[in-house]
């Protein structure tokens, strides 16, 4: 009888964890090492085109100063959008969600995201983590 209760409890916990994981549609799209000098050609190319409707940026291992970002969509006309991003992100800080202009179904297939910026207040290169939400 005790083993039946243990198995039932284990299944219930597994089911709760499974449903929680499915409810979270956030994916780490990639990480970019930010150089110490201003650079305007930092690109995150997605190997598989991802449907994304908004992104978050997070700084790890140092502070970041950003001067621009663009997102490129997989389309015959190479559609792109300039993103409105914060100029500074402190270490361990995550931005609010940044919405991506989208087509009628409120989603687009993202192929590349580019950034301009650099590491500040750190001897090591900071990293910029890009999180997507579909």
From Swiss-Prot:
Any single Pfam family the record assigns to this protein: DUF2541
Signal peptide: 1-23
InterPro entries for the chain: UPF0412_YaaI
Assigned keywords, A-Z: Signal
Disulfide bonds: none
Family listed: Belongs to the UPF0412 family.
Protein name, as recorded: UPF0412 protein YaaI
Annotated organism of origin: Escherichia coli O1:K1 / APEC
């Amino acid at each position: 009888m005790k083993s039946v209760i243990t198995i039932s409890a284990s299944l219930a916990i597994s089911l709760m964890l499974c449903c929680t994981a499915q409810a979270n549609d956030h994916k780490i799209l990639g990480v970019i090492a930010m150089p110490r000098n201003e650079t305007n050609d930092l690109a995150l190319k997605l190997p598989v085109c991802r449907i994304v409707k908004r992104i978050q940026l997070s700084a790890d291992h140092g502070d970041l100063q950003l001067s621009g970002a663009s997102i490129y969509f997989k389309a015959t006309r190479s559609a792109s959008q300039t993103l409105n991003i914060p100029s500074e992100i402190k270490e361990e800080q995550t931005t609010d969600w940044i919405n991506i202009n989208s087509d009628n179904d409120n989603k687009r297939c993202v192929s590349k995201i580019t950034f301009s910026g650099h590491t500040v207040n750190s001897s090591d290169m900071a990293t910029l983590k890009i999180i997507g939400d579909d």
